[in-house]
Regions:
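N-terminal localization/anchoring segments of enzymes in phospholipid and broader phosphate metabolism
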Residues: 1-331, 335, 339, 379, ...
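Helical hairpin unit composed of two closely spaced alpha helices linked by a short loop
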Residues: 340, 350-372, 376, 381
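Short alpha-helical functional segments enriched in proximate histidine and acidic residues
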Residues: 347
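Histidine/acidic-residue-rich catalytic or RNA/ligand-binding cores of hydrolases
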Residues: 356-358, 385-387, 417
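Short, solvent-exposed amphipathic alpha-helical segments in soluble enzyme
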Residues: 360-364, 390, 459
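Active-site donor-binding acidic/aromatic loop of nucleotide-activated sugar
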Residues: 402-406
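Catalytic-core elements of nucleic-acid end-processing and repair enzymes
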Residues: 413
Length: 493
């Protein structure tokens, strides 16, 4: 029997389809059964949808974006560091359980249940001797950062999702190199995907001066990174153990308003005081999870006695990610919203939370709480942008006021309630930040800071458009289609 070329193609196509079917079947089994404890039901269904619609392409996407790193791979070499803070956490938990909150601060007493919940995290010990300044403009922020680097005496630790070596990045790198020449310890931890244009070779001069650099989840293969799903989205600076920074600004010219999105509106905190110990602890834990050289452990020089009374702003630092036992920041946000009596002000560039978070916001609004949500008017990630808008209908119907920021790009991640307390940090209000990425937020029980940030929010409203039920209902059919498609896959964005 003679075989034609078309017969061969048909046979080959059949074999490819069979292989694709088997791969999809195996992958579906893995997603449903083997990873059920590390994946939500909505995420499971979203991945099954992708595999069904895009059989072979879906498999490739899963290799890059679907796998979650086991916690045991991230918690190595940290026993000694954690042990030194276990006693403090245990003591505070026991005191709170007895109704002894250890402070006269009214907001800590009022929100003692939130404080108690955050104490369940290894970074979450409560500190009160703190002074907090806030920044909403990148130029102001990095002018202060560069001044603080210049004034450093012993060491500087930086941990960033994006460390772009453009104009701003070079200024910071040169400032750090000057401190190395003065004999200071300087360490940089950057995310390999968030800083994708950065190569380790870019730091050769920095390292020749004694600086240390690590890339978080660096790929061993060029152009291929199979750990893209779990990224270090944290932004932390610690200087001399006396002051620290945490918030939404990355390092790069874009965050000074020089990118295609225009003015960059974000929120960042500068903290002086005991809460810096928690930021230092977080940096050490993250560094130790990636470092190829000998680890560094608890040392009094990294947790020094602070320079006298600094302020009275109680702070807890909360970190979450694949290595965490539970979703600390998401639950912190949710607890704040559910405890609000008067007002809630939310800002997030990506708003794709799960139903429980959406329901908390709806319940607050239906209970008479004045709830505000601010999101971007322009996309930096189109699919995420449409998924964000897909949640608007339910929220508007519940009485939530939604604003689209028109004066550039809103990148701030903030939850503020009752002009009493606020959470600021790196966590967006979406599935990726709540479950997949490594994030860090400060929960600050400070009326002055809360009121200052509410004033900034009200100024942002003057630069925004309010989204109404009428305008949302009249959006084009093409927009409705994009939102529906984005909503289907939103749990895996």
């Amino acid at each position: 029997m003679r075989y034609t070329f078309s017969n061969d193609l048909g046979t080959l196509f059949t074999i490819i389809l069979a292989i694709g079917f088997i791969i999809n079947l195996v992958l579906a089994f893995i997603i449903i059964f083997l990873e059920r404890n590390r994946r939500t039901a909505s995420s499971t269904w979203a991945w099954l949808f992708v595999l069904f619609v895009l059989p072979l392409i879906g498999f490739i996407l899963y290799l890059f974006f679907g796998r979650t790193v086991p916690a045991r791979k991230l918690n190595k070499n940290n026993g000694k560091v954690l042990t030194d803070f276990d006693g403090l956490l245990k003591q505070q938990i026991e005191s709170f359980d007895k109704g002894n909150y250890g402070t006269d601060n009214k907001q800590v007493q009022k929100h003692h249940d939130l404080v108690r919940m955050l104490l369940m995290d290894q970074d979450g010990f409560l500190t009160e001797n703190n002074k907090v300044d806030h920044f909403i403009d990148g130029n102001d922020l990095y002018d202060q950062v560069l001044q603080d680097i210049k004034n450093a005496k012993e060491y500087i630790h930086l941990e960033y999702y994006t460390f772009a070596l453009d104009g701003l990045g070079q200024r910071i790198l040169k400032a750090l190199e000057e401190k190395l020449k003065q004999g200071l310890e300087v360490k940089i931890l950057y995310d390999d995907v968030g800083s994708k244009k950065v190569k380790m070779a870019n730091f050769d001069h920095f390292k020749s001066l004694g600086g240390e650099v690590e890339a978080f989840f660096a790929s061993k293969l060029p152009l291929l990174n199979f750990r893209m799903n779990n990224r270090n989205h944290r932004k932390i600076i610690v200087i001399d153990g006396q002051l620290g920074y945490v918030g939404g600004f990355n390092i790069g010219d874009e965050y000074l308003g020089l990118g295609k999105l225009g003015y960059w509106r974000d929120t960042h905190l500068r903290i002086q005081g005991d809460a810096v110990d928690a930021l230092q602890l977080r940096f050490i834990l993250d560094w130790n999870s990636q470092a190829h050289r000998p680890q560094f452990e608890y040392d009094v020089k990294y947790f020094p006695k602070k320079n006298g009374p600094l302020g009275n702003s109680p702070i807890q630092i909360a970190a979450s990610g694949p290595a965490s036992d539970w979703h600390q920041i998401e639950y912190g946000y949710t607890k704040m919203i559910m405890s609000a009596k008067k007002s809630v002000y939310l800002q997030s560039p990506y708003f794709i939370p799960d139903n429980s978070y959406i329901n908390a916001i709806k319940i607050a609004a239906k209970s008479g709480v004045d709830v505000h949500l601010m999101i971007p008017c322009k996309p930096d990630h189109p699919l995420v942008y449409w998924a964000t808008y897909s949640n608007a209908s339910d929220l508007l119907s519940s009485g939530v006021k939604i604003y689209t920021y028109e004066n550039g790009f809103i990148h701030s991640k903030m939850c503020l309630i009752d002009d009493e307390m606020v959470s600021v940090g790196t966590a967006n209000m979406d599935f990726r930040s709540f479950e997949l990425n490594f994030e860090v937020n400060a929960f600050v029980y400070d009326e002055k800071l809360a009121k200052d940030l509410r004033v900034a929010y009200e100024h942002d409203i003057t630069k925004s458009k309010q989204l109404t039920k009428e305008s949302y209902a009249n959006r084009p059919l093409s927009v409705k289609f994009k939102e529906s498609l984005a909503k289907l896959v939103s749990p895996i964005l």
